[in-house]
Amino acid sequence: LPVIFATRYGIDLWIWLRSVLGRRGVAVLSTIISVANFGWYAVAASLFSSSMINLAAKFGLVLNAAVWSPVLGCLCVVLGTLIALGGPNVIKWTNRFLVTALLAVGVVVVVLCFTAVPLREIVAVKPVLDADMTPLQAFMISAEGNVAFAFSWSTQALVLPRLAKTERGGYWGTTLAYGVVAPFFVAAGGVMALAMFVRTGVYESDPTNMLSYLCGSGFALLSLLLVAFANVGTQGTGSYVNCMIVKSGMPKVSYKVLVLIAMVYVSALTVWGGVEEHFGAF
């Protein structure tokens, strides 16, 4: 129903929440949620910078992480901001290209991981539990994380259907994106991490390191496409959606002003690095 409302009438989640929370309530809640959501984009920028540094190292170019990590992270944010400033049409075509390319890369990555490490060894990996944590507590923490993940994305997912021209397009675009494409990439990342653990005994989060170790340095170029395009595109789409969320509560504020404020905010979080350091609590 939220998708149909957004497509047919242009009434997204935050507009029809005014009937429950009122204009001031929506303004406060949308701002708080967007301020929190932007922390994830600082993590994405940090992942972009670390992957680019690691990729450069694979080809013999050593970059000082203390200098280049914040520089490359802010570059990711700036490139994403340019996409967001381009408006819905630029975002539409950017995502059409990115999703197609990244799906192809994702399929290749999964095949390579299963080729490098037998499936039976991947599925045999047991979860690592803290000594003071029971299996039930571990499950509860995982469930809480999944609920938080779904909640944070739902605040954005129910805005994007406004870009669709038909109800059918809005419905299938939203359903396939969050029901098929996003879970596929989560699963692909999990397969890569488990395969890396089987080979090295260490859990790794950087796809550049995982691909280069599992499949050779040549395949690390796939991570350049995966990480660079994905995180820059994520910055652009995320900036657009979250700024539109805030604008739903404060319609008189300029969209471009919100995007530029978001750029400064996410860049500051990226340079600080605290969100990634305390990601579990975040």
Predicted regions and their residues:
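Selective recognition of specific alpha-helical transmembrane segments in multi-pass small-molecule
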Residues: 1, 33-42, 101-113, 145, ...
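Juxtamembrane transmembrane-helix boundary signature
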Residues: 1-21, 30-45
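Membrane-water interface regions at transmembrane-helix termini and the short interhelical loops
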Residues: 3-4, 20, 28, 54-60, ...
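Transmembrane helix-loop junctions in multi-pass membrane proteins
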Residues: 6, 45-52, 81-90, 112-123, ...
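Hydrophobic transmembrane alpha-helices that form the core helical bundles
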Residues: 26-62, 228-248
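Transmembrane alpha-helical segments of multi-pass small-molecule transport proteins
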Residues: 30, 59-86, 100-111, 138-157, ...
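Hydrophobic, small-residue-rich membrane helices and short re-entrant helix-turn-helix hairpins
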Residues: 86-99, 152-184, 202-208, 238-254
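Hydrophobic, membrane-embedded alpha-helices of multi-pass small-molecule transporters
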Residues: 112-116, 128-194, 215-236
